[in-house]
Amino acid sequence: MVSQNPNRQKVELNRTSLFWGLLLIFVLAILFSSYIFN
């Protein structure tokens, strides 16, 4: 599969990693707050 625009793949990869980073922070925040309030 030949990609004509490699920059587009890089942007999608950054967007995906940003999404997983935010999801990880969100889950850690939920676990941390539940740990504090218990």
From Swiss-Prot:
Q: Which parts pass through the membrane?
A: 17-37
Q: Which domain of life is it from?
A: Eukaryota
The UniProt entry's GO biological process terms, in alphabetical order, are: photosynthesis
Classify the main location. plastid
Q: Which InterPro entries match?
A: PSII_PsbL (IPR003372), PSII_PsbL_sf (IPR037266)
Task: List the membrane topology term(s).
Answer: Single-pass membrane protein
Q: Name one Pfam family in it.
A: PsbL
Q: How does it assemble?
A: PSII is composed of 1 copy each of membrane proteins PsbA, PsbB, PsbC, PsbD, PsbE, PsbF, PsbH, PsbI, PsbJ, PsbK, PsbL, PsbM, PsbT, PsbX, PsbY, PsbZ, Psb30/Ycf12, at least 3 peripheral proteins of the oxygen-evolving complex and a large number of cofactors. It forms dimeric complexes.
* Name of the molecule in the record: Photosystem II reaction center protein L
Q: Which species expresses this protein natively?
A: Cyanophora paradoxa
Q: Give the gene that encodes this protein.
A: psbL
